[in-house]
């Protein structure tokens, strides 16, 4: 007999989908069960600014959404100290609110389940006057931020958490701060003595299983520039300081080819109009060049430690059972 789609949809939790509708009743039940399992795999991504979810990790987020995993994003600031790369896209006074709108667009482009904005202020790069702003994220009380992140973990109960590597990709103070706060929250969320007030209010300790850091290999900026220049783009070579950015290649556990999700990642990036200059080259270069530069992402598995000889799976949820 035919499967009654509407009847089954009424019993699915938020975020679950039916893969097929024209199937037998028995198969329909099996498909729902599989989709429920996939939907019970959860990833929490914790970053500092609008566009942090786009440029370095957009492919991984898109691939997990496409696989039916539940993906939630937490962003700590509005990126008020970012550049305005499109003339007329914003003013210094309006940039934060414009970037709020851009972030909402990016979340929809990636298909994320939900998003939380903590609304600290962008601290700017090290040495900027913005470092001294009382609302700057780097001046936030560590206890308060970590308590909030532990609450996020205990509420959403992710098996996998994603943030920046401890150096913040290129030394951005906010990137370094979110890495520190997220790592500490990962380690504390399972401890019933940590933030016991949360347990008194009905939350339970939760032990996420894996923590991944977004990273880039040292020398990546020069590789990118050479690739784009070879494709005919007048792309600037990195500065001496930029050549120092990145992690030693041996520290990176995963180099992922996520080019199958390049269109989704590019759509997410282009939501951040204030951050994409008219000279942005990736929509002009040949597809294989865009795939090489934008379709590759790099990750370090920070928890659990990777013992010598272990090959880290390309699937960040590999062998994790839904719960």
Region spans (language model):
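Metal-dependent de-N-acetylase/amidase catalytic core
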Residues: 23, 30-33, 37-44, 131, ...
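Active-site rim/loop-helix segments in enzyme catalytic domains that contact anionic ligands
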Residues: 30-156, 183-184, 191, 300-301, ...
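Intrinsically disordered, low-complexity segments enriched in serine/threonine/proline/glycine
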Residues: 7-8, 20, 31
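N-terminal hydrophobic alpha-helix used for membrane targeting or insertion
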Residues: 2, 9-10, 40, 163
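Short hydrophobic targeting helices and cationic amphipathic motifs
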Residues: 4, 12, 17-18
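Residues in and immediately flanking transmembrane alpha helices
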Residues: 17-20, 62-64, 85, 187, ...
């Amino acid at each position: 007999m035919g499967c009654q789609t509407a009847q089954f949809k009424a019993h699915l939790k938020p975020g679950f989908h039916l893969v097929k509708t024209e199937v037998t009743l028995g198969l329909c039940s099996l498909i729902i069960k599989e989709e429920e399992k996939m939907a019970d795999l959860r990833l929490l991504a914790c970053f500092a600014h609008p566009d942090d979810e786009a440029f370095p990790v957009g492919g991984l987020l898109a691939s997990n959404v496409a696989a039916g995993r539940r993906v939630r994003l937490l962003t700590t600031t509005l990126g008020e100290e970012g550049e305005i790369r499109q003339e007329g896209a914003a003013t210094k006074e309006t940039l934060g609110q414009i970037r709020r709108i851009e972030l909402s667009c990016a979340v929809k482009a990636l298909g994320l389940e939900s998003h939380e904005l903590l609304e600290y202020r962008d601290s700017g790069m090290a040495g900027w006057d913005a470092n001294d702003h009382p609302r700057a994220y780097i001046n936030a009380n560590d206890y308060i931020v970590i308590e909030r992140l532990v609450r996020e973990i205990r509420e959403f109960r992710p098996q996998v958490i994603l943030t920046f590597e401890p150096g913040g990709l290129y030394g951005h103070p906010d990137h370094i701060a979110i890495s520190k706060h997220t790592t500490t929250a990962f380690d504390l969320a399972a401890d019933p003595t940590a933030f016991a007030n949360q347990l008194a209010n009905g939350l339970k300790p939760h032990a996420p299983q894996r923590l991944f850091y977004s990273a880039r290999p040292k020398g990546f900026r020069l590789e990118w520039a050479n690739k784009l220049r070879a494709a005919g783009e007048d792309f600037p070579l990195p500065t001496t300081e930029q050549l120092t950015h990145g992690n030693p290649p041996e520290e990176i556990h995963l180099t992922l080819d996520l080019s199958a999700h390049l269109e989704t990642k590019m759509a997410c990036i282009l939501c951040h109009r204030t951050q994409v200059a008219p000279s942005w080259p990736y929509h002009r270069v040949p597809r294989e060049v865009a795939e090489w530069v934008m379709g590759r992402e790099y990750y370090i598995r920070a928890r659990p430690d990777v013992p010598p000889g272990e090959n880290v799976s390309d699937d960040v949820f590999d062998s994790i059972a839904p719960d």
